[in-house]
């Protein structure tokens, strides 16, 4: 909040002070959190084009100036020196992992990459040609029945475990959905492969033609995931925050965000 800076709002001849808030990149906003309490008025802002819903130190993006930073680090630097797994850890914890922390987080991703075997049969219920994003949203929601206790308290106690389950299993779900769409048998995750290599292998390996790992393709996927790791307060993020505010199970919350992401106007 800018020190001693206020905007003056006059309603029916009465003056009200609205604190001026300044972001790290110099953006300015008016704090109207006390508006209704102090004046009895609310604001009308269709589409929330003029509203910042929260304070955040996770991501800064300015498309016009070509700026994207995660936790203050330019995405170009992360793309050059970090992996997607390191970037995910950065977004979760506010700093890049040490060697030991990276090993521990990577191990969690591997240990939680498998789906419950009963979930394989769920894919048989989708019609041929079903939208892959709709399948993904449904299957993520189904995870909430296998992990019913992933709530606010469990997230506070072990954010790494909850995040690892989600980050790892979404990759497995996406690969299974793709294999189902082309009529090929599913490919299970492998602990000896990196995050991106594992995803590619699940997508393109075949019983009749083993997938030959291409390091350039692995690198390209890694860069793609880094660039899309977080994009500030967009529609899907807002959806996740809104649904999650009711203390909904983590997987059901993320499922809602995926549904928002599937929309053509996202």
Segment roles from a protein language model:
Residues 2-265:
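Hydrophobic alpha-helical bundle cores within soluble ligand-binding/oligomerization subdomains
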